[in-house]
Curated annotation (Swiss-Prot):
Binds 1 zinc ion per subunit. This is Rhamnulose-1-phosphate aldolase. The gene is rhaD. It comes from Listeria innocua serovar 6a (strain ATCC BAA-680 / CLIP 11262). Transmembrane segments: none annotated. Keywords: Cytoplasm, Lyase, Metal-binding, Rhamnose metabolism, Zinc. One of its GO terms (cellular component) is cytosol.
Length: 273
C-alpha cells in the first residue's frame, strides 16, 4: 500500500514555497511557476506509476527527459491556493518515452494542465542537468525590484550583475557567475524557452526584462534563496537610488577579497583590474 502523497516532503516543500512567493508579492494572480524533478524512488512511495490518469501532449521535444518525474504547478493556478488545495493546483507528471507528451500520475483534479511555461522549464532542466547533474528545481516569479530594475538600469549582463554584487556583500558568494539576461520575448513559447535555456548553461539566474526572473538550483531552498538574494540586492538598489544615488559601494578589490575568502571566483571580465 502506498503512503498518502499529501504527507510527501516534496508536496509540503512546494506548498510552503508557493505560499511564501505569494506572500512576498512575487506571484500575483496566476503568475509564476515551478517544476521540481523527483527521484523515482520517492515517487513510488506514494503513487502507482503505472496508473496514468491522462496523457497530455507537448509542443516540445522532451526526449532528453524521457521517463523523468516532475512535480509541476498548474496552468492558470494561483500560488495562494496551493496549500489549501494541492491536488487541484499541482500535478505529478512523467515525461513519455518519446518525449512528446507527459503522463499525469496525480493532481490537476479539476481537469487542469501543467504550467504553460512547461517548455521553458524543461529546456532549462535539460541545460542545467548538462552542467550540474544534481539540479532539481526551476522556478519563475515576478520578483518586484528585479523587475523594476529592468526599466531603469542598463540591460547588459555585466552592468546588471555588478550592481547587484555591489548592493549586498553576500551576492558575489551566492551567484559568482552573475545573472543572464534575455531580450523581451512572448511568454509560453518555445522561443523564450530556447533563449532561457541557452543562458542556463552558464547562469542559474536569468532575467526576463519587464516580466520576471528564472532561477535554478539543486533544492527548493537553494533556488528560492538564490532569487531572494538577488531580489534583496535589487530592493537595496531601489532604495539607494531613491535616497539620492550611490555615494560609495563595495569596491572591486573588496569583491576579489570576498571571493578569495569564500572560495568563489567572479565571472571573468566582470571585475575591473
Amino acid at each position: 500500500m502506498t503512503k498518502d502523497i499529501l504527507d510527501a516532503d516534496f508536496i509540503k516543500e512546494m506548498a510552503k514555497t508557493t505560499s511564501n512567493l505569494y506572500r512576498l508579492g512575487w506571484d500575483e494572480r496566476n503568475g509564476g511557476n515551478i517544476t521540481y524533478l523527483l527521484d523515482e524512488k520517492e515517487v513510488v512511495e506514494y503513487l502507482d506509476v503505472k496508473q496514468i490518469i491522462r496523457t497530455i501532449p507537448m509542443d516540445f521535444d522532451g526526449e532528453k527527459l524521457a521517463g523523468k518525474y516532475f512535480l509541476v504547478t498548474g496552468s492558470g493556478k494561483y500560488f495562494k491556493n496551493v496549500e489549501e488545495a494541492p491536488a487541484v493546483n499541482l500535478g505529478v507528471i512523467q515525461v513519455s518515452e518519446d518525449g512528446k507528451a507527459v503522463h499525469l500520475l496525480w493532481g490537476y483534479t479539476d481537469g487542469g494542465l501543467p504550467t504553460s511555461e512547461l517548455p521553458a522549464h524543461f529546456m532549462s532542466h535539460i541545460a542545467r542537468l548538462s552542467v550540474d547533474p544534481e539540479n532539481r528545481v526551476v522556478m519563475h516569479c515576478h520578483a518586484t525590484h528585479l523587475l523594476a530594475m529592468t526599466f531603469t538600469h542598463e540591460l547588459t549582463e555585466r552592468a546588471f550583475t555588478r550592481t547587484l554584487w555591489q548592493m549586498c556583500t553576500e551576492c558575489l558568494v551566492v551567484f559568482p557567475e552573475g545573472v543572464g539576461i534575455i531580450p523581451w520575448l512572448v511568454p509560453g513559447t518555445n522561443d523564450i524557452g530556447k533563449a532561457t535555456s541557452e543562458k542556463m548553461k552558464e547562469n542559474r539566474l536569468i532575467v526576463w526584462p519587464h516580466h520576471g526572473i528564472y532561477g535554478a538550483g539543486q533544492s527548493m531552498d537553494e533556488t528560492f534563496g538564490l532569487i531572494e538574494t538577488a531580489e534583496k540586492a535589487a530592493e537595496v538598489y531601489t532604495i539607494v537610488m531613491s535616497q539620492g544615488g550611490i555615494k560609495q559601494a563595495i569596491t572591486d578589490e573588496q569583491l576579489k577579497a570576498l571571493g578569495e575568502r569564500f572560495g568563489v571566483e567572479a565571472k571573468a571580465g566582470y571585475l575591473n583590474n
